[in-house]
């Protein structure tokens, strides 16, 4: 898997793993602007999501990201 820092958009399921929450929690949090890790935009009837590496890092800390990356490469 590519390092999170190199990703333009962190996948919902990765953010959910990092925060120990469900993907639905992440989606709703972004839709309601409760999670300061990215944005959600409604396009017609579907939502699109952007999770920023920098915003996620600022929210949970680099140590948690490093721990996650080490875990998935074992």
Predicted feature residues:
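Short, low-complexity interaction segments enriched in Ser/Thr/Pro/Gly
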Residues: 2-5, 18, 39, 52-54, ...
